[in-house]
Amino acid sequence: MPRIPGVNHQDAVRALRKAGFQIIRQGKHIVMSDGTRQVTIPRHNPIKAVTMGGIARDAGLTPEEFRKLL
């Protein structure tokens, strides 16, 4: 699994917005969608590296593409 260490949940939301995702709902987790894919971001800091890698993969991004969006 790709690793993207030390990412704040707010930075992750900002990066996914740049990738075309919109917030669907918020609570203890933030659910975002681009119309075809849906990702869930936990609302704690920092997000674990393995978890963030999985979120990037679910969003259809490589770790390098995600880092560029940060």
Q: How should each PLM-predicted stretch be described?
A:
Residues 2-19:
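Polyanion-binding surface elements
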Residues 1, 19, 38-39, 63-70:
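Ribonuclease/tRNase effector modules and their secretory precursors
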Residues 18, 22-53, 57-58:
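A short, structured beta-strand/loop element
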Residues 8-11, 44-70:
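C-terminal structural segments of small proteins and small subunits
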